[in-house]
Amino acid sequence: RNAAGDFEIACEEPAAAPAGATPAAGAWPPRKRHGLSGPIEEAFDGPFVVVTGTAGNDDEDRRLAAQVERWADEWDRFADGRPPVLLDSQVTEAVIARRNLVLFGTPESNLILARLHDRLPVRIGPQRYEVAGKTYEGPDLGMVLCYPNPLNPQRYVVVYAGALYGERCGINHKHDLLPDF
């Protein structure tokens, strides 16, 4: 807080990756287009499924299950409907073909995230994230990512890793103030 009691936020360097050349057709990531242009709320406008990780240790799996339960409860209050939730081991190719995936965990704790992690623009580890060559670490950090799904470029993948976003956001803005890819 400053002397007036207001919160001030200072950022010396942006945490976003620099813009590059537009990718050629068929390149990864695919070009933005109608239905795959962001922002993150677009991932929730179509059919989606929430996926909790089961590949971690027992404590991690319980923590992820609790996060998913809390997120699903908040979504229910926000959208007046509980989202479908699957374990990572229950996700089939048919699910990947038909739905946007909302993944919770890290590549070490979520089997689906482990399958596509190498094709995401960030590196995700326990309490650490690498974006555009910069590493951010800490026990209270979290990350939310929306990106074309490498397993189905016609759909999105949304990743929640670490601490949940929006602890102090009202329920009406918790899911619509996040950026796009």
Positions of the model-derived regions?
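Solvent-exposed alpha-helical segments and adjacent loops
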Residues: 1-181
